[in-house]
Every structure is written in C-alpha cells, then in structure tokens.
Amino acid sequence: MSFFKQLRFAGEIIRANITKHWFPLTVSLTVTNRCNLKCVYCYGSYFNRDIDDFPTEFWLKLIDKLHTMGTKLVHLEGGEPLLRKDIGKIIDYVKGKGMICRMNSNGYLVPASIQEIKRLDSLCISLDGDEESNDKNRGAGCYKKALDAIMVAKRNHLPVLSSTVLTQNNVENGAIEHILSLAREIGFGSQFNFLYEQT
C-alpha cells in the first residue's frame, strides 16, 4: 500500500474516533469454500469441494453495501479465490468503488490469472519455508508454484508478500530465516501466522 493510501486509511480511523461513527474499515470476504490444495493444518474441508459459491451478483451487492458504510479495504480470501471464474470482475468492482483490494492465494493459479488480478493493491502468497518444509505442509510442488506466483506478480508490478503459517515442522527447519532471506533476495514483504486451536 502506498504512503498516501496508508495516510488516507489512518485519517479514516482518526475521523471515526472523532465523530464516533464506526464502520468496518477493513472487511475480509471468503469468496469461496473450495480449494485445490489440502494443507495438513487447514481447519477447513475445502479440498476439491463440489459446492456452489455465492453468485457474482451477491458479492457485487455486498460490496455496494460495504462502500456505502464507508469500508476502505476489502480482503478476498477462501479457500482459493482464484478458483472463481469471476474473480477479476469482483476485484474490478472493488477497485471501481475506490476501495483498496487485497487477496490471499496459494499461488498455483496466479500465472494463468495474472491479467484478471493485476489491479489488486497487494497479493499474499502462502509460503511455509524452504521447499522441503513448505511441501510437507502444503503438498509436493507447492514451493515452486508459490515462487513462480511471486515472480509473475513482481513482473506485473503487483505488490506481493508471503504468508507463512508457523508449525513445529517449519520453525525447527529454519522457515523464518529462509523466508526473510528469500524476501530480501527477491524483494517481497512477509508475514508470519501462528496456528491456533479450533474450538
């Protein structure tokens, strides 16, 4: 996010504090419960799920309502959002409302979908450490797919960051150090998440 967008976002928080007019500044939308991966720690049963997603019109109407309420940032997640054929339309609609739009992805479908998603303000790619640790958590070949996605995003001037779920497996194998080194080398941001127990 650019400095000016951050400044504008901070201004909205200050305005809400002064006016006491609260609204959801940031909203995460789970646009699908389907996923093409079966990560070992995932709490959802998303893998190869054969269910219908809410239709495009549902999301566009919801985005209209969020815009009217004053929402400034919409974060698209899943499952794997790129399994939706209309993801480009949803992104364009959010951006057309002047809102910031971010998305999470496992990276598999990014190269094939880059034209639909390059208007995003940022793309967050799942990456859990070096190839061995990552693929142990996410499945064979996922590390290379994630790196491909990061490189495609960078070539298309799409700000990208990695999202790492910290587990005993990858922490003991130097995941944090590997990700930070890779981020410096290639040039992307990184965030780290802890597993939490589902209740």
Which residue ranges define each predicted feature?
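Conserved C-terminal portion of the radical SAM core fold
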Residues: T30, M69-H75, K95-R102, D121-S122, ...
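Conserved radical SAM core fold
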Residues: P81-L83, G107-I114, C124-A140, L166-N170, ...
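Secondary-structure boundary/capping signal
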Residues: C39, D50, E131, C142, ...
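Conserved alpha-helical substructure of the radical SAM core
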Residues: S2-S113
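Distinct, well-ordered alpha-helical segments
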Residues: G88-K89, P111-K118, G174-I179
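Short N-terminal secondary-structure initiator segments
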Residues: L66, G70-L73, D128-A146
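Conserved non-cysteine loop/helix-boundary elements of the Radical SAM core domain that shape
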Residues: F47-F58, G79-K85, N134-I150, Q168-I179
